[in-house]
UniProtKB/Swiss-Prot annotation:
Molecular functions (GO terms): lipid binding; proton-transporting ATP synthase activity, rotational mechanism
Known role: F(1)F(0) ATP synthase produces ATP from ADP in the presence of a proton or sodium gradient. F-type ATPases consist of two structural domains, F(1) containing the extramembraneous catalytic core and F(0) containing the membrane proton channel, linked together by a central stalk and a peripheral stalk. During catalysis, ATP synthesis in the catalytic domain of F(1) is coupled via a rotary mechanism of the central stalk subunits to proton translocation. Key component of the F(0) channel; it plays a direct role in translocation across the membrane. A homomeric c-ring of between 10-14 subunits forms the central stalk rotor element with the F(1) delta and epsilon subunits.
UniProt protein name: ATP synthase subunit c
Major subcellular location class: membrane
Keywords assigned: ATP synthesis, Cell membrane, CF(0), Hydrogen ion transport, Ion transport, Lipid-binding, Membrane, Transmembrane, Transmembrane helix, Transport
Record's keyword annotation contains Transport: yes
Single GO biological process annotation from the record: proton motive force-driven ATP synthesis
Pfam families with a match to the protein in the record: ATP-synt_C (PF00137)
Site (Reversibly protonated during proton transport): E61
Transmembrane segments annotated in the record for this chain: 5-25, 57-77
Subunit structure: F-type ATPases have 2 components, F(1) - the catalytic core - and F(0) - the membrane proton channel. F(1) has five subunits: alpha(3), beta(3), gamma(1), delta(1), epsilon(1). F(0) has three main subunits: a(1), b(2) and c(10-14). The alpha and beta chains form an alternating ring which encloses part of the gamma chain. F(1) is attached to F(0) by a central stalk formed by the gamma and epsilon chains, while a peripheral stalk is formed by the delta and b chains.
Entry-linked Gene3D superfamilies: F1F0 ATP synthase subunit C (1.20.20.10)
Native source species: Mycobacterium tuberculosis (strain ATCC 25618 / H37Rv)
Location in or out of the cell: Cell membrane
Length: 81
């Protein structure tokens, strides 16, 4: 097998992980900003705001783990001889 294919798989896997990490970081930051803004405006609504926040963060992190699975597929399923 051509070594450029293996190198391409590794570079592609790295790009997938980098994009997923950047997206997850931005998503978590936006959700955290909305939570802090909401609690600062209405402190009594803190209990009602935490549930949607944790659901949003969980979905964002789930998308990152899906990226991790695709990275593993690209890197480890590439046949290298």
């Amino acid at each position: 097998m051509d070594p450029t294919i293996a190198a391409g798989a590794l570079i592609g896997g790295g790009l997938i992980m980098a994009g997923g990490a950047i997206g997850a970081g931005i998503g978590d930051g936006v959700a955290g900003n909305a939570l802090i803004s909401g609690v600062a405006r209405q402190p009594e609504a803190q209990g009602r705001l935490f549930t949607p926040f944790f659901i949003t963060v969980g979905l964002v992190e789930a998308a990152y783990f899906i990226n991790l699975a695709f990275m593993a597929l690209f890197v480890f399923a590439t046949p290298v001889k």
